[in-house]
């Protein structure tokens, strides 16, 4: 997995290599200082040789200055490498998400995807940038060089800290094995916190309207406490690393002082050599502590890396594998014995044995009770989901044979949940066509009756919509979305209950405008109100995922029980 993660460093690898080179030279210079100090004490101070003291002092100062410059360089290069790696991983994840089908997205919670794009990437990033690269590069070099020098000073004394190495290794392995699953749980707790915050902010108006602020506060307190507890469990285990290392380190130093003192007394070791040896032992033990911290950081990064790889390794179930270089020309639609379920392991189909035919330019209404899979049915046309059995055809060709870009360019959907983006009204309309002229935009707005209220907006087409279009009503938002879809100039237009917030008079104008101005466009209208579909060329009745009846308003009113019941209930409610 590490190899895959670091493959995203790409053009930033040179900065990582430069950082490691700077770190390596910096460490060598730092390790020269104790050797120079030993010579200064044993040959300069001991014999009062002032010129020798000055010479060694200048050499030590030069090493320190060069090490400082290289330290700054390594910090800069490692930061560039870490930030670049993080940016590339985020981009790779985001690109992968754009290729997800609806069923792929259903495998993850939105809050979890946000965490995997932010917090998890930051953990990987930190393991490469200053906080990770420097100790990762410094510790092995310091350990190898300092150990070699320590043995060259006195091999007998060096055996003391060799005893400590297996103890330190065993302690570190035990901590890592225990802490890795705790880091995974902590990241999952962050997912839950993000989900709670996201839901609250998205539905803040509902929360206020139902006076549920206290309930939401309690819910947040619960997930916040859960994150705190999971974090405490992880970090309680992590902090054991430092005192355990220090215990072994101080015990080792004490042993070296006892044995070294005896060697000095016997004349087998100079005071400067003992001082230098202790300096190298401290360097060795500090390098081991740094390595242990690096391992802990890598453990957390690996937990995050595994979550990131789940996003990148998600198998895309809707591809262009069977696609040919063709485009939708007419908008003829055919469902041929289609069966569909969201999950392969599900026992029952959501849609069963669906068959119907729509001629180019026809207007087709789809009506049925809530939960009858009306939306699911139309989502099969642009391949937001793929059928399990049967075939969906456009212009006599299986939709799987169209390149997805060409297929979806030819189909415009106005979904149940109307989405507007931050920006001006004009920029939202141009989502339908970036190159649309103002004349085309005004024409689309006229058909969708947007022109009826646009003059009342503070800045007309330049009015800022706010996040999600908060400064326009539900009906106005629906009309804007319809205009946006018209600007796409599709061969097939799907309106999924997208006039539910529009009054019947305005809805009639929109219907008339679509019929007169866009007669060749195939139109599919999902609706709850019979008034929205009664003028359609064909009306399809769905019931529990099956077609219960098809025909015109008059024929269904004459012989379809479900249609009659809907008609009578709405007639009583004065909707017709």
State the predicted function of each range.
Residues 326-576:
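ABC-type nucleotide-binding domain
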Residues 21, 29-33, 70, 118-164, ...:
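Hydrophobic alpha-helical transmembrane segments of ABC transporter permease domains
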Residues 25-29, 33, 61, 66-82, ...:
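Hydrophobic alpha-helical membrane-associated segments
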Residues 10, 16-73, 77, 151-156, ...:
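Transmembrane helix-loop-helix hairpins at lipid-water interfaces of multipass membrane proteins
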Residues 1-11, 113, 117:
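A short amphipathic helical element positioned immediately N-terminal to and/or at the very start
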Residues 49, 148-163, 176, 233-306, ...:
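Helix-loop-helix
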Residues 11-14, 99-103, 119-136, 140, ...:
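An intracellular "coupling" helix at the cytosolic face of ABC transporter transmembrane type-1 domains
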Residues 47-48, 83, 91-115, 119-121, ...:
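Short intracellular "coupling" helices and adjacent cytoplasmic loop segments at the cytosolic face
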